């Protein structure tokens, strides 16, 4: 990597002949400071040429590892010290123009980037031409972020999708041969009227459907979460944009976020034209409503763990408070899935138990391992499912040196383990598309403790971890393998039915909508008859 640019230094008065010797002395000192800290002077910087006009001193600077913003601030400090002492000349401002960054190889980057005027490939190197940067821009780490962004884009392009970096860790034995149930539970739940489509990717869960979701969730809490010492907290479900900026979700997954806007005013009279229109026309045109709300300042709960990092942000933690082990199940999460929406498996609004923890690296790894054992027992013994675990390394860990060759990966470092369950209705288990990711467990390293400035009072490194249990997907997994007859369910679920009788399903003159749906519901009632509240 190489940098080159023209730095315009505005001084406190016009340069006169008597100043030139002092300027030469100052620039000699600048030369020493531009290579300071580098064993190889080529990695530092140098002043290739200089000129002046009026009160502006102009320097052409080139450098290796030393970024131009850093070089510019070094120049400022030296000029202020030398010229201020010898000639009573002060520095009033800086402006970097015609700046160029040369990168090895061809960087496959498209689109428009801040402060970037254009790209070109010359002799196998990528040349990036930057827009002018004033002193305020140079003081901010804009150039550093830009270079990181370019690196991330290149890493993303090489890294590809998750499927390219998926490696099987462990798989259960074959239990369903042949599968006792092969129907699609998504269709059965809808046809029998247990759920009703509310909007795209949203469902209303009738009391019986809500009961089934709660059943799976409660057994999970009893078998996995509470025995490991996690305690419940309640997290907000609408987050300021600043939180998403720190977690990286706003930059990395903005296409999946659902945003929220507030009204421009609380004065109801300001809405009179709109409310009158809606009264007369009995419609709410989105484009008109949009005129009365602010630009989005929030996004709805996406990963559910974001408030955990925010809470500890800027705080000092001691050993007595560690490890911190919380979980939240207080409300829905939202993800815009576009064309991939299907049944209860892939929705915009869903419910989950989010398990989060904070501690030293050793504590975080130990907790993850305890959770992993509990998850395996939950899937294999408690729910008696066909399951598998896969190691998935998020692309952004490549930059931090945490990526290894897949044949020698180590799970005790930042990364993610996915839990997948076979859905017989999709086809044979040998087909990867027949497996559903029902949850995951992650070690983040310092990915969140650093941007939120979560610190240990003795300077020890702090890591975080999280695990998401999506209630809808786990329920679908159980029903897909076991069906709707409780006699085929594992003992823990039948015990829950006996302790907590399920409610009657809803039946109306016009609901369920179809004859086949009514038959499905009648069959379900027969299955549950010995447990229903009657």
Language model features with spans:
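TRNA-recognition modules of translation machinery and tRNA-sensing kinases, especially anticodon-binding
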Residues: 1-534
């Amino acid at each position: 990597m190489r940098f080159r640019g023209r730095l315009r230094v505005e001084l406190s008065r016009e340069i006169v002949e008597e100043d030139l010797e002092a300027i030469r002395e100052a620039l000699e000192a600048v030369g020493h400071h531009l290579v300071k800290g580098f064993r190889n002077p080529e990695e530092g910087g140098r002043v290739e040429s200089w000129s002046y006009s009026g009160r502006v001193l102009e320097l052409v600077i080139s450098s290796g590892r030393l970024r131009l913003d850093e070089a510019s601030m070094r120049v400022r400090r030296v000029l202020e010290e030398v010229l201020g002492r010898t000639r009573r000349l002060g520095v009033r401002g800086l402006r970097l123009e015609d700046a160029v960054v040369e990168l090895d190889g061809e960087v496959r980057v498209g689109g428009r980037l801040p402060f970037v005027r254009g790209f070109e490939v010359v002799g196998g190197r990528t040349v990036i031409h930057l827009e002018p940067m004033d002193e305020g821009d140079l003081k901010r780490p804009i150039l550093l972020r830009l270079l990181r962004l370019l690196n991330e884009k290149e890493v993303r392009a090489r890294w590809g999708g998750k499927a390219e970096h998926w490696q099987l860790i462990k798989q259960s034995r074959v239990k369903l041969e042949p599968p006792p149930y092969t129907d699609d539970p998504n269709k059965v739940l809808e046809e029998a009227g247990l759920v009703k489509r509310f909007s795209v990717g949203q469902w209303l869960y009738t009391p019986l459907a809500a009961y089934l979701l709660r059943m799976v969730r409660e057994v999970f809490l009893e078998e996995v979460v509470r025995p490991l010492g996690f305690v419940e907290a309640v997290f907000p479900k609408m987050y300021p944009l600043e939180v998403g900026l720190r977690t990286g979700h706003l930059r990395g997954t903005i296409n999946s976020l659902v945003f929220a806007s507030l009204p421009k005013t609380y004065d109801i009279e300001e809405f009179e034209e709109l409310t009158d229109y809606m009264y007369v026309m009995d419609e709410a045109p989105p484009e008109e409503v949009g005129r009365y709300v602010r630009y989005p300042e929030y996004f709805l709960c996406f990963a559910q763990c974001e408030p955990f990092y925010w809470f500890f942000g800027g705080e000092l933690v001691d050993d007595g408070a560690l490890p911190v082990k919380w979980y939240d199940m207080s409300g829905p999460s939202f993800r815009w899935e576009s064309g991939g929406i299907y049944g209860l498996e892939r929705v915009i609004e869903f419910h989950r138990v989010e398990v989060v923890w904070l501690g030293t690296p050793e504590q975080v790894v130990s907790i993850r391992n305890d959770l992993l054992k509990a998850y395996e027992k939950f899937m294999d013994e408690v729910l008696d499912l066909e399951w598998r675990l896969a190691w998935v390394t998020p692309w952004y860990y490549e930059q931090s040196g945490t990526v290894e060759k897949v044949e020698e990966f180590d799970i005790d470092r930042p990364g993610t383990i996915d839990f997948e369950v076979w859905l017989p209705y999709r086809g044979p288990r040998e087909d990867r598309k027949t497996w559903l990711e029902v949850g995951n467990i992650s070690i983040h390293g310092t990915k969140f403790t650093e941007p939120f400035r979560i610190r240990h009072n003795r300077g020890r490194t702090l890591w975080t971890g999280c695990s998401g249990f999506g209630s809808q997907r786990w329920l679908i997994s159980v029903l897909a393998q076991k069906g709707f007859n409780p006699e085929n369910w594992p003992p823990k679920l039948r015990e829950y039915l006996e302790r907590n009788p399920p409610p009657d399903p809803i039946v109306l003159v016009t609901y369920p909508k179809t004859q086949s749906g009514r038959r499905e519901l009648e069959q379900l009632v027969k299955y549950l008859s010995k447990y229903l509240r009657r």
